[in-house]
A protein has these predicted regions:
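Positively charged, low-complexity intrinsically disordered leader regions
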Residues: 1-23
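Glycine-rich beta-alpha junction loops
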Residues: 9-11, 59-60, 85, 185
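Conserved phosphate-binding/catalytic loop of the ribokinase/pfkB sugar-kinase fold
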Residues: 83, 93-126
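Short glycine/proline- and charge-enriched loop/turn segments
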Residues: 19-27, 180-183
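Short beta-strand segments
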Residues: 4-7, 57-58, 93-95, 103-105, ...
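Conserved beta-alpha-beta core of the PfkB/ribokinase-like small-molecule kinase fold
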Residues: 129-195
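Substrate-binding N-lobe of the ribokinase-like
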Residues: 27-87
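Conserved small/polar residues in nucleotide/adenosyl-binding loops
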Residues: 198-199
Length: 199
C-alpha cells in the first residue's frame, strides 16, 4: 500500500479571466473547483493506475468537509483527522495574461493531532511506501517531515519526499528512498541558478 500524507489540503478555485485588470471588476470566462495538495494528487494518480493507496491528512471546517466529500466521490481510501478550529484552505488560481496564484495558510495543527497521525502510521510495515508531499502549516515547523522519518527509521519503511527548502533539506540525513525536487527546488537547495554557479 502507498500511504500519502497531505497536511495542508485545499480547495483550488481556478478561474480564467480575459485581460485581467487590477482594481477593476473582472468577469470570469471559466471556473472550476478541485481538491488540491501534493499528497492527494499522488493518490489520485495511483488510483487511476490501479495501485492501492490511502490518503492521510488533516481537514477543518466546511472546506474540509467538501474535500472529504470529493475524495470519497473518487472512491479513494482516506483517513482524515478533523481539526476542531479553522477551515481547510482555499487557493485561488487566476489564469489571464499571466498565471497568478494566491494560496491560503491553512489551519493550525496541535501536538495532539500530530500524535493522532503518528498512531495511524503505526500499521505501516516494510512492505508499504509512505509519501510525504507538499507544504506544511507554520504550526508544524520545517522539521516536521524529518521528525516523522526519525520516528520511522527503524521500521524499514520506504519514504518518498516531495517538498522544498528547509522542509526538504531537513530530511536528507534520514536518507529517504526518493526525493522529487523540481528545478526551482534544486536551485534553492544547492544555492545555484545556472551552469556557471555549478562549476
Amino acid at each position: 500500500m502507498v500511504y500519502t500524507i497531505t497536511c495542508n489540503p485545499s480547495l483550488d478555485y481556478g478561474v480564467t479571466v480575459e485581460n485581467f485588470q487590477m482594481g477593476h471588476t473582472n468577469r470570469t470566462v471559466t471556473e472550476q473547483m478541485n481538491v488540491g495538495g501534493k499528497g492527494i494528487n499522488v493518490s489520485i494518480v495511483l488510483k487511476h493506475l490501479g495501485i492501492p493507496t490511502k490518503i492521510l491528512g488533516f481537514t477543518a471546517g466546511f472546506t474540509g468537509r467538501e474535500i472529504e466529500k470529493r475524495i470519497k466521490e473518487q472512491e479513494i481510501e482516506a483517513e482524515w483527522i478533523r481539526l476542531p478550529q479553522g477551515d481547510s484552505r482555499i487557493n485561488v488560481k487566476l489564469l489571464s495574461n499571466e498565471g497568478t496564484e494566491i494560496n491560503g495558510q491553512g489551519p493550525d495543527i496541535s501536538k495532539k493531532e500530530v500524535q493522532e497521525l503518528e498512531e495511524k502510521l503505526g500499521i505501516l510495515t516494510k512492505e508499504d511506501v509512505l509519501v510525504l508531499a507538499g507544504n506544511v502549516q507554520k504550526s508544524l515547523g520545517q522539521t516536521f517531515y524529518a521528525d516523522m522519518m526519525k520516528k520511522l527509521k527503524d521500521r524499514q519503511i520506504r519514504t518518498v519526499v516531495d517538498a522544498s527548502g528547509e522542509l526538504l533539506k531537513a530530511v536528507l540525513p534520514y536518507h529517504p528512498f526518493l526525493i522529487k525536487p523540481n528545478q526551482d527546488e534544486l536551485e534553492g537547495l544547492f544555492q545555484v541558478k545556472d551552469r556557471k554557479s555549478v562549476v
